[in-house]
Regions:
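Short substrate-entry loop that stabilizes the transition state in hydrolases
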Residues: 72-78, 82-121
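Active-site-proximal cap/loop segments of hydrolase catalytic domains
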Residues: 111-208
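Non-catalytic accessory segments flanking enzyme active sites
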Residues: 1-75, 97-100, 104-105, 149
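Structured core elements
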Residues: 9-10, 53, 61-66, 80-82, ...
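Acidic/polar loop patches that form or flank catalytic/metal-binding clefts of enzymes
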Residues: 30-32, 74-76, 154-156, 181-182
Length: 208
């Protein structure tokens, strides 16, 4: 941004487009300066996620998104539940290449911001401190119930995956339910004792 705070350049990503450089000037419409990815994207099958929100069993609203294979919403699809890491991170409005790849291969992909995610206030984020696998797990299972009821999903072909905290939750899920037909845990926490003192984020998540 400029020293007088009247001009700024930035990169912007949308759910269906990779990052491009934009320009903002005070009092003027924002302007896209680059089109680096137009040719590449024109050769790909990109699908836009649909936002949904459901009321959890404790009365709180939980945000989620679902993607379907391009131009294919009438038939039932196998689905993959994606769980983010952190858990102090959050899904939002952006293009996620692995989700697009799975959708292009015929899978529906759904993902939510359960308790423990950032962007919803400290109470939401800290709800899982010392209680991993409790309210967060309930949010994810209730999201799955909601998705299977509302969307054309083949409930006999639903998988789950995630990395880091998402990998921990994948492990937790397969240890507590048989509803998923496949699971892939990535860079996960599988042992809290060995994880203590060896994590790349230090010996504690945050200072209480």
């Amino acid at each position: 941004y400029s020293a007088d705070h009247t001009t700024a350049s930035y990169t912007q990503t949308t759910p269906t487009h990779l990052s491009e450089v934009h320009l903002w000037r005070e009092g003027r419409p924002e302007k896209q300066l680059t089109k680096f990815n137009n040719t590449r994207l024109s050769r790909l099958h990109i699908t836009a996620p649909e936002h949904f929100s459901f009321k959890a069993s404790d009365g709180m609203n939980v945000d989620g998104w679902i993607m379907f294979p391009p131009n294919s919403r009438k038939q039932k699809h196998p689905a993959i539940l994606q769980i983010h890491g952190g858990p102090r991170t959050a899904y939002g409005i952006g293009l996620v290449h692995e989700f697009q790849l799975l959708a292009a291969q015929g899978f529906a992909v759904y993902y939510i911001n359960p308790r423990g995610s950032s962007s919803y206030g400290e109470d939401w984020t800290c709800a899982v401190a010392g209680h991993y696998g409790e309210r967060d797990y309930a949010d994810i299972m209730e999201a799955t119930d909601y998705v299977l009821k509302k969307y054309p999903i083949d409930r006999k072909r639903v998988g789950v995956t995630g990395g880091s905290y998402g990998g921990f939750m994948t492990n937790w899920i397969v240890g507590h339910t048989n509803r998923f037909k496949a699971a892939c845990t990535q860079r996960c926490i599988s042992n809290w004792v060995s994880f203590f003192g060896t994590s790349d984020i230090g010996w504690r998540f945050s200072q209480e």
